[in-house]
């Protein structure tokens, strides 16, 4: 989130932001971005647009745009997807279990386009949360940011807001008494 916020401060956008383009080096905890041809760079005279964007990370409003026209909203959405997956067992925020009344199976990108986000305060008519989801154990403040990121008509959190929330989560991380290798975020307990 810090890297994304820093780039946004200078008017640059990642656009093709996805886990495969991010690496963390264990020894130094340095974060590196790869495959940077998906960036949109603001030059002194002109913008050098992105050339690529990846499905499952494209914001709903961006489906009608070319990646050359995408900007900060694309990065805000993709960053929220990555953070959701990191905090929720690798589950994509638009994946879930289709309800019995669902007419057909939709791809993740189709679910994004139709705002089928099952993990929010209001649930979803198309799908229920994935059975291995642990979203209910996340703090309310984190869930509110996810709702803002994925519910239609909301103002998506900035990278700086995510940075502050992740700092909050790290500072409030609790260790499980039953398993020293396990940690959790809220007073709801760890589930073990």
Show the residue positions of the predicted features.
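Catalytic-loop of the protein kinase fold
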Residues: 4, 8-26
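Activation segment/activation loop of eukaryotic-type protein kinase catalytic domains
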Residues: 20-62
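Conserved end of the kinase activation segment
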Residues: 62-73
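Terminal C-lobe "cap" of eukaryotic-type protein kinase domains
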Residues: 148-174
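Regulatory extensions appended to serine/threonine kinase catalytic cores
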Residues: 164-167, 171-192
